[in-house]
Every structure is written in structure tokens, then in C-alpha cells.
Amino acid sequence: MAVLLLGEVTNGALNRDATAKAVAAVKALGDVTVLCAGASAKAAAEEAAKIAGVAKVLVAEDALYGHRLAEPTAALIVGLAGDYSHIAAPATTDAKNVMPRVAALLDVMVLSDVSAILDADTFERPIYAGNAIQVVKSKDAKKVFTIRTASFDAAGEGGTAPVTETAAAADPGLSSWVADEVAESDRPELTSARRVVSGGRGLGSKESFAIIEELADKLGAAVGASRAAVDSGYAPNDWQVGQTGKVVAPELYVAVGISGAIQHLAGMKDSKVIVAINKDEEAPIFQIADYGLVGDLFSVVPELTGKL
């Protein structure tokens, strides 16, 4: 058996955390080949080659892959699929766009958010907002799946995998790049951050979210938000943590003004230490918190920030 793993490449750089955790998840299935695709992907490929457990790295450099369009990447993967029994990717926003297309082109099912691999055909994935674990046995000749990287520790350094160039696939011509609107931030990326401070609807306004950002900056943390806060317009969509947002498992997760709806808990319950700040002592978030503080967040959070 052999595994083709799509590396997460953004602006020519490898998302090492997501890729290394995915390598750790699949390495027991057989030799792991990491595919790095982008307009500039050689540096990312060299980085992927250093990850322990990687047997080979393929690099596809072409302007076609420069704007993260799903259709060209899916076509590239399908063209390489013949040599592999398993095709996987970390469950990032990009991969969730690409992998279902790969599965459709191969006429197999896609397994999303795999949290454990029991054997070559059997996988576990969370369902019902993380309240149950589904065991899935696939009879497809090729398994296509995304990996819930929060469930795995990252593979270490020390790899010396060879890097080989591969030709770009033909452009399917189904979509074209128009423009990128990128928000610049000095904060760590949400899904790989060691610390996360998230705010909920209890903040009351977009302006009040500034106190969350100030605390996060003092902690060197990423900023997250509940779905309720995002839906209310208090925070941008890419900050959303939860079942329909991003899944995180940092060393420290601080939930401020978040009640603890099941949808939110599904995205952060694997955090190592959870701190909850809420004025409602009956809030469900306190049931999973390691540390809880009942109080007015508008008093407590600025005081905490001031003491850091």
C-alpha cells in the first residue's frame, strides 16, 4: 500500500503543522508521498522532505496552482492516483474543497474529518457535533479522505525524502482566478496556534471584540469566535471555531462570553487546557472547562490583560 498526501501550501510556504500531523496519521498505511503544488512550491517541498515518515515528495510548480483553485489541483491528484491506495489531506479549508472533487472524479466516496485510522479500510470520524464517533469501513479500491489534524501529534524532523518534479495536469477550465483579498495579521494561524482566545455573543458588539484581541496579543495567541459572534457580525468568518468553522486543539483555549453550544464545543473540546469566562454560572462551557471564572467579562478580561 502507498499513500498520496496533499501538502498544505500557501504562498509558496508549507503549513508544516497540518502536514506533519497528517503524515503522523497515515504513515502506518504504507509509504507516504507528499504532493506540494503551487506557483512556487519547491521550498515547501524541501520542507516536507524533512518530516519524519515521508518517503518521497512530489512537487508540481505551475501558475495553474498559484491561486488555490480546486479543480486544477483535483485533476493533478487524479492523474497521480494510479500509484496509490490511499489519497489524503489535512482537513483544511482548501482540502475540503479539493478532496470531494477528487473522490467524484475517481467515483469513490470521500471520508471527511477522519480522527483515527483503525486499518487500511476502517476509519473513525466524529458525528453529531462530536458527541458520537462513527466507524466507517470502505470497500472502495482507493480511499479518499481528509484528516482531522487536531486528533494527532505532529511527526518530527529528521526526514531525508527525495524530491521529484511532476508535470502539471491539463487545466480543466472550470474556474478562473479573479482576485485575492487577504487579511494581514501578525497573530499565529488559528488552527496551528498553541494558544487561542475566543469571544462569543456575550461581547455584544464588533467594537467590544477589541478586548479579546488585546488579551490574545498579550498571550501571543490566535483569535477565535463562536458561530453566534460571527453570525452577529462581531468577528470575521475565518475566526469561527466549531463544527462549521475551524477545529482547534491548542495547549490553552480561553473562551470569553461563550455559552458552550454543542456546535462550538465540537471545534475546541480537544484543547489541552480550557479556561472559561462567563457571567452565567450555568453556562454549558463550564462543564468542560479546566478553569472557570464567573464574572463580567468587561471587568475581568481587561484586568487579566493588565496583569500579563
From Swiss-Prot:
<dbReference type="GO" id="GO:0050660">
    <property type="term" value="F:flavin adenine dinucleotide binding"/>
</dbReference>
<comment type="function">
    <text>The electron transfer flavoprotein serves as a specific electron acceptor for other dehydrogenases. It transfers the electrons to the main respiratory chain via ETF-ubiquinone oxidoreductase (ETF dehydrogenase).</text>
</comment>
<dbReference type="InterPro" id="IPR018206">
    <property type="entry name" value="ETF_asu_C_CS"/>
</dbReference>
<dbReference type="InterPro" id="IPR014730">
    <property type="entry name" value="ETF_a/b_N"/>
</dbReference>
<dbReference type="GO" id="GO:0009055">
    <property type="term" value="F:electron transfer activity"/>
</dbReference>
<keyword id="KW-0249">Electron transport</keyword>
<dbReference type="Pfam" id="PF00766">
    <property type="entry name" value="ETF_alpha"/>
</dbReference>
<keyword id="KW-0285">Flavoprotein</keyword>
<keyword id="KW-0813">Transport</keyword>
<dbReference type="Pfam" id="PF01012">
    <property type="entry name" value="ETF"/>
</dbReference>
<comment type="similarity">
    <text>Belongs to the ETF alpha-subunit/FixB family.</text>
</comment>
<keyword id="KW-0274">FAD</keyword>
<dbReference type="InterPro" id="IPR029035">
    <property type="entry name" value="DHS-like_NAD/FAD-binding_dom"/>
</dbReference>
<dbReference type="InterPro" id="IPR033947">
    <property type="entry name" value="ETF_alpha_N"/>
</dbReference>
<protein>
    <recommendedName>
        <fullName>Electron transfer flavoprotein subunit alpha</fullName>
    </recommendedName>
</protein>
<dbReference type="GO" id="GO:0033539">
    <property type="term" value="P:fatty acid beta-oxidation using acyl-CoA dehydrogenase"/>
</dbReference>
<dbReference type="InterPro" id="IPR014729">
    <property type="entry name" value="Rossmann-like_a/b/a_fold"/>
</dbReference>
<dbReference type="InterPro" id="IPR001308">
    <property type="entry name" value="ETF_a/FixB"/>
</dbReference>
<feature type="binding site">
    <location>
        <begin position="252"/>
        <end position="280"/>
    </location>
    <ligand>
        <name>FAD</name>
    </ligand>
</feature>
<comment type="subunit">
    <text>Heterodimer of an alpha and a beta subunit.</text>
</comment>
<dbReference type="InterPro" id="IPR014731">
    <property type="entry name" value="ETF_asu_C"/>
</dbReference>
